[in-house]
Amino acid sequence: MKQLNVHLISDYGVDALIAVSRASLERFEHLVSAEHHLWPSTTSIEKLQQVFLHIERSSFVLYSIRERIIRDTLKDFCQKRKIPCIAVLSRVIRELSSYLGIEPIHTSKEEYQTFNEDYFARIDAMNYVLTHDDGQNTWDLDEANIIIVGPSRTSKSPTSVYLSHLGYRVANIPFVNNIPLPAKLTTLENILIVGLTINPDRLIEIRKARLSISQNYDNPVYADREQILEELTNARKTFIKNNWPVIDVTHRSVEEIAAAIMKEYTMRKY
């Protein structure tokens, strides 16, 4: 049985890489013994160079990295050492077959095309959204493509999920009166931060419906008109102060909100 060291390198999570590696190696079941080495959050040349210390010549590298300079550095390192270095889903099974000298079991052209880079970019993006919903895990906001800020019930979460299906890593953060936003927001570069606002009457209507559904009547200020007016006013002031584009979501569908955000994203060329 052949031994194989598989290094999985990503600028975020490695779940997608693990999935495709295992699915590919199943074609060589009982023929190859593989050991996986996981290198998530490889977001800089410095981090990549630390990974290099662990890659031996008898290795197989799979990667998913968006930053061109990091990709090129990895490919150059592997090329000089004649180490196979494959972008995920660039004919992974075919490359494994060539490297190992073993014909894969029950493969077809269609199976090679089952997945593609966009699919796994979406998987990574969805994982990011789920772990960065409603202000969670603000420590790595610099990994996001887009950050959405807005009061409760302004469609932050569904819009984030929708954008993740397009392959964008999106975090959303609630704006709440008298609770400061993460200080990190003012230091981020090359990340689109957008503020969502809404007509106060519409927001009152939505929040009252929410309270009725949840039967949570212990928070009367949640749908109080004066509180909502103050919250929306303060939110808009914060957005303008930080030069964040403001998008009014009143009577807009999630698709329309996402389209407006993508327009800002494209205009600013992030």
Swiss-Prot record:
Pfam families: Kinase-PPPase. Keywords: Kinase, Nucleotide-binding, Serine/threonine-protein kinase, Transferase. ADP binds at G150, P151, S152, R153, T154, S155, K156, S157. Its EC number is 2.7.11.32, 2.7.4.27. One of its GO terms (molecular function) is ATP binding. It comes from the Bacteria. It is an enzyme of class 2 (transferase). Disulfide bonds: none annotated. It catalyses: N(tele)-phospho-L-histidyl/L-threonyl-[pyruvate, phosphate dikinase] + ADP = N(tele)-phospho-L-histidyl/O-phospho-L-threonyl-[pyruvate, phosphate dikinase] + AMP + H(+); N(tele)-phospho-L-histidyl/O-phospho-L-threonyl-[pyruvate, phosphate dikinase] + phosphate + H(+) = N(tele)-phospho-L-histidyl/L-threonyl-[pyruvate, phosphate dikinase] + diphosphate. Belongs to the pyruvate, phosphate/water dikinase regulatory protein family. PDRP subfamily. Bifunctional serine/threonine kinase and phosphorylase involved in the regulation of the pyruvate, phosphate dikinase (PPDK) by catalyzing its phosphorylation/dephosphorylation. This is Putative pyruvate, phosphate dikinase regulatory protein. It comes from Neorickettsia sennetsu (strain ATCC VR-367 / Miyayama).
